[in-house]
């Protein structure tokens, strides 16, 4: 069963009491992110109905579920998503969190497409260079949009929750990540962010850490979407898709090992894409670490459980660190 990006249903509290894994007494207005549970050896799945909830015999083919451990080695745990759905899944932020969850699945699918493109090119079935070029645009664009989704989450949380330090006056935060970290196109220092928006130093430091990578991501996307710049030349080699080792912004990421660069100066685009996805996810994880020391959150919705992501394309996400560390090509 596919349970990704399902619409939010209203279910009576009394009906939710039949799900033994939920801490109904401490919901505090939060929504339930999934009714899929894996408890050691057995799946438990509830479906909203007009009468409340109905237990059914099902398991997720693609989607997210609660468990004490992954049911499959390929099921992914992300601290950011687990924290948000367990402790901050209010209706005002749920759709943004769900959009980030969906983007993670989409990035896995997008990365896996390159294997299809590579095999199709080797078999001379299609001209795949432009396939790769447009997919690179998609990955950069999706990662860029995830920062704005994250900022929507931050702004909504900021308006609705209590700070540990209640002497700090709260202001409304912009819903654009760019406005939080850039001024006149330049990265703002942590102290300037703190002064501009009246946020705690810990949160301003988080924005400062994320700003430089975000600025590169934004500039690449804006050059293509808003300024009419064509994507960098993508080369098709026997080992997969490549760019010149001098190509920016890719060269500035410093992800290529010298022994993986071809004699003609071409380097695999694969570790570049891995780097972009890794840094985007790290920024989300960093936020989860930071915000827990600033905002008072209710306890876990499903105590003792974690959220795991199941997808058809998780393997690409699991391999990200290895691909980046080893400057891997598609024939590796």
Roles of regions detected by a PLM:
Residues 2-102, 126-137, 151-332:
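Acidic, Ser/Thr/Gly/Pro-rich intrinsically disordered interaction regions
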Residues 101-130, 148, 152:
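A short mid-domain helix/strand-loop element embedded in enzyme catalytic domains
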Residues 143-145:
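Loop-centered beta-sheet repeat module
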């Amino acid at each position: 069963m596919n349970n990704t990006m399902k619409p939010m249903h209203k279910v009576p509290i009394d009906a939710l009491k039949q799900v033994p894994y939920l801490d109904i007494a401490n919901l505090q207005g939060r929504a339930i992110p999934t009714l899929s549970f894996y408890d050691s050896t057995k799946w438990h799945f509830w479906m909203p109905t007009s009468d409340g909830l109905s237990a059914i015999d099902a398991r997720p083919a693609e989607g997210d579920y609660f468990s004490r451990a992954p049911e499959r080695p390929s099921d992914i745990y992300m601290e950011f998503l687990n924290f948000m759905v367990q402790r901050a899944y209010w209706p005002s932020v749920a759709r943004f969190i769900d959009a980030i969850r969906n983007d993670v699945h989409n990035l896995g699918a997008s990365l896996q497409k390159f294997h299809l493109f590579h095999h199709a090119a080797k078999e001379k079935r299609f001209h795949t260079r432009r396939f790769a070029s447009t997919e690179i645009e998609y990955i950069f664009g999706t990662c860029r949009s995830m920062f704005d989704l994250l900022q929507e989450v931050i702004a909504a949380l900021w308006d609705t929750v209590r700070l540990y330090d209640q002497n700090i006056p709260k202001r409304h935060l912009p819903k654009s990540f760019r406005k939080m970290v850039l001024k006149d196109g330049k990265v703002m220092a942590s102290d300037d962010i703190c002064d501009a928006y009246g946020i705690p130093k810990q949160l301003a430091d988080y924005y400062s850490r994320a700003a430089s990578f975000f600025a590169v991501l934004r500039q690449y996307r804006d050059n293509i979407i808003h300024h009419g710049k064509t994507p960098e030349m993508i080369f098709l080699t026997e080992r997969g898709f490549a760019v010149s080792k001098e190509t920016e912004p890719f060269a500035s990421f410093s992800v290529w090992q010298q022994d993986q660069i071809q004699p003609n100066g071409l380097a695999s685009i694969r570790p570049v894409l891995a780097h972009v996805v890794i840094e985007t996810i790290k920024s989300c994880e960093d936020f989860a670490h930071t915000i827990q020391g600033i905002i008072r959150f209710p306890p876990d919705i499903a105590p003792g459980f974690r959220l795991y992501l199941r997808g058809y394309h998780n393997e690409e996400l699991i391999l990200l660190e290895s691909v980046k560390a080893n400057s891997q090509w598609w024939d590796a």
